[in-house]
């Protein structure tokens, strides 16, 4: 009995990858691997397998990104002008960032022994440059009037800054002098795209810049104000103005808006 249990335990401890994971790891393209991950994730043996599957997505998408980046670098060195597939490069960067965050999520969960033993901590450094590429990718899409694509790339870049995946990235490396400018543009695009929650997030960052503070505040007030269809909407907007004014009592724009609302509400 004991011997049989030991055999079963040994079999479990040294079991190979599940068929679901093997199928993912055999995939040679990101599209095929992603489809298999979505199809087979629930059939994988444990969280470690899920992390391994998402890491395979990181590898495939980073190859797509790095292949095009290498052409750019060689063009600079050799003074050639070999074609670069920027669409493939940008999509590779985006997919790598998304997959790395999913990999991290499963990689940080306790194993069967209750211990956290991450295997893919290097993904943070690995995808950092890909993350930064999304700033240029979003701006390129913006100049081509592709708002949806611009926000896809910028939102991924912006929202991932607070991801625990990047907790160990040095502060000096995280410094991004263009952040407030992109946040301002992102706020405006998000408002136009009716994504008000994301617009407010961008506004809060853009308002940290003297250059964009006034314009970002105007966008924020427009978003907070909304349509003011009901009395409750107006009261909510007034309370939002009060909260902002309490933090910036010298701001005449906020004071003017408050006085205007008080007058309209006969308060």
Would you name each region that the model predicts?
Residues 20, 40, 50, 57, ...:
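Structural register within alpha-helical repeat arrays
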Residues 27, 57, 64, 144, ...:
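Structural motif corresponding to the intra-repeat A-B loop/turn of tetratricopeptide repeats
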Residues 62-148, 152, 156-180, 197, ...:
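Short coil/linker segments at helix-helix boundaries
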Residues 38, 98-101, 155, 204, ...:
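Alpha-solenoid helical repeat scaffolds
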Residues 45-48, 108, 162, 211-212, ...:
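Short coil turns that delineate tetratricopeptide repeat
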Residues 24, 61, 141, 183, ...:
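Residue at a conserved register position within TPR or TPR-like alpha-solenoid repeats
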Residues 14-17, 129-136, 175-185, 210-220, ...:
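Generic helix N-cap/helix-start motif at coil->alpha-helix transitions
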Residues 14-69:
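Start-of-domain marker
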């Amino acid at each position: 009995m004991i011997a049989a249990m030991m055999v079963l335990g040994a079999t479990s401890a040294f079991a190979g990858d599940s068929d679901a994971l093997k199928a993912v790891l055999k995939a040679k393209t990101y599209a095929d691997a992603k489809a298999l991950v979505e199809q087979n994730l629930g059939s994988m043996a444990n969280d470690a397998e899920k992390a391994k599957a998402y890491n395979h997505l990181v590898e495939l998408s980073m190859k797509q990104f790095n292949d095009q980046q290498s052409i750019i670098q060689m063009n600079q060195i050799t003074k050639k002008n070999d074609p670069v597939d920027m669409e493939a490069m940008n999509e590779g960067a985006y997919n790598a960032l998304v997959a790395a965050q999913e990999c991290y999520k499963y990689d940080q969960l306790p194993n069967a022994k209750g211990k956290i033993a991450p295997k893919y901590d290097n993904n943070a450094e690995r995808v950092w440059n890909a993350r930064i590429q999304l700033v240029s990718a979003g701006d390129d899409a913006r100049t081509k009037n592709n708002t949806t694509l611009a926000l896809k790339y910028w939102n991924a870049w912006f929202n991932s800054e607070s991801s625990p995946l990047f907790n160990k990235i040095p502060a000096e490396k995280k410094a991004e002098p263009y952040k407030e400018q992109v946040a301002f543009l992102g706020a405006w695009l998000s408002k136009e795209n009716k994504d008000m929650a994301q617009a407010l997030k961008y506004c809060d960052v853009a308002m940290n810049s003297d250059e964009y503070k006034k314009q970002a505040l105007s966008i924020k007030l427009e978003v907070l104000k909304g349509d003011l269809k009901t009395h409750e909407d107006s009261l909510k907007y007034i309370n939002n103005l009060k909260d902002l004014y309490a933090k910036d009592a010298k701001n005449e724009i906020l004071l003017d808006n408050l006085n205007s609302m008080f007058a309209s509400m006969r308060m």
